[in-house]
Amino acid sequence: MNKVISKKEAIAHVHDGSVLMVGGFNTSGDPNELVEALRTKTSVKNITLISTDSGVTDSPLTNMLSEGRFKKVIGTFFGANKEIQKRVNEGTIEYELVPQGTFVERIRSAGAGLGGVITPTGVGTVVAEGKQKINIDGREYLIEKPLRGEVAFIRAEIADESGNLVMIGNAKNTNTVMAMAADFVIAQANQIVKTGEIDPDDVTVPSIYVDAIVLAGEEI
């Protein structure tokens, strides 16, 4: 099955009120072309964004933030994003700040169909507010619920037409786990090859998790 689609077809899967996962961290592995297409070619809004850092200065995600397109942001690090800091301080956006390890495990648990993550991280801090707790062998843990998206934008170096992906180095980051934790997964790839041209040992994300592929650099 050939899963290659246009950017126009890809962004049509995001609607007003969607829960959108975006892979990458601090410019590494960011599917910026998909986000920019969503920003410039649609008017969707009230999106809940699940992203490690919600973009850096002048990134497509930050530009969407400044346009007020996100209703809520769930992430781990907002220190490099002045726009989200501004909106949080103004009270014009909902946000959930999650410890980075917990963030990844919550996504992984969604992909595995689990009911959540049990972790000591955040006990006794603001992170624990409003969350269910459990005591195991005299130690207190938080029960963190899974994080799942309706649509995920991820990025790969190489994809084959069936959706097998190759990711390189630290660009793997959250892209790998988000591929397993969304209802519809779209990969932006720098190169697309015929099915069978990627050595199975080189596959980072198998095609079973990928619903669509777009080629980076193509016009919308």
Describe the residue ranges of each PLM region.
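Conserved alpha/beta enzyme-core scaffold
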Residues: 1-220
